[in-house]
Amino acid sequence: LYVSFIGSDFVEEGRRAGRWLLEQFKDATEPVNIVELQGTTGSAPAIDRKAGFEEVIKENPNLKIIASQTGDFTRAKGKEVMQSFLQAHKDIDVLYAHNDDMGLGAIQAIEAAGLVPGKDIIIITVDAVRDGMQAAADGKINFIVECNPLLGPQLMDAVKAVVEGKEVPKRIVTEEGTFTSEEAKAALPDRKY
């Protein structure tokens, strides 16, 4: 029915977020308390990003998700849920948000609570949209895993291959990167989204 699927690997996005966190806290001997803003309940990105993240962080028993709730991929809900997390937990070390918008909303809540995002609470997000990249460049987001919407070049390569009678993989994973604060600063001027 179809020749190939081109898109993101959401599990791998979660793994990349987890690997970065694992590296940052490799010497941790005390609990590292993580709160998680999940995407829309039941959506593939929310399920898969959570699974990939958890798969990796379980390597360090000090990394603990102490609260996890949907933020519906929106800035407003991310802010609202983060406010609840901050009221319920006084010892949050890390926020993992399944997208930049929820992370940006959470930053508003963190700042309103008198805390410094990116310093008092380490922030990891997924997407790498312009606003998220700017927040990373400003030091408010520590690490972003890209979810690249620019599929055109990979799509055209696959179409040309099919037209030429060549075999193409059933699944082609989008080319995506990761960004620390410094890398976001460098990449921001050339971002297309």
Stretch-by-stretch model annotation:
Residues 1-8, 39-41, 66-69, 91-94:
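Second-shell loop/turn segments in exported
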Residues 1-2, 30-33, 60-65, 90-93, ...:
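Loop/turn elements at helix/coil->beta-strand transitions in domains of secreted/extracellular proteins
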Residues 6-31, 77-79, 128-132, 147-164:
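Hydrophobic alpha-helical segments within soluble ligand-binding/sensing domains
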Residues 9-13, 17, 32-56, 152:
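Extracytoplasmic ligand-binding site segments that recognize negatively charged/polar headgroups
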Residues 33-36, 54-75, 175:
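Short beta-strand elements in bilobed, periplasmic/extracellular small-molecule ligand-binding domains
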Residues 37-45, 56-57, 147-193:
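Hinge/cleft segment of the Venus flytrap/periplasmic-binding protein
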Residues 52-53, 66-67, 71-134:
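Hydrophobic alpha-helical
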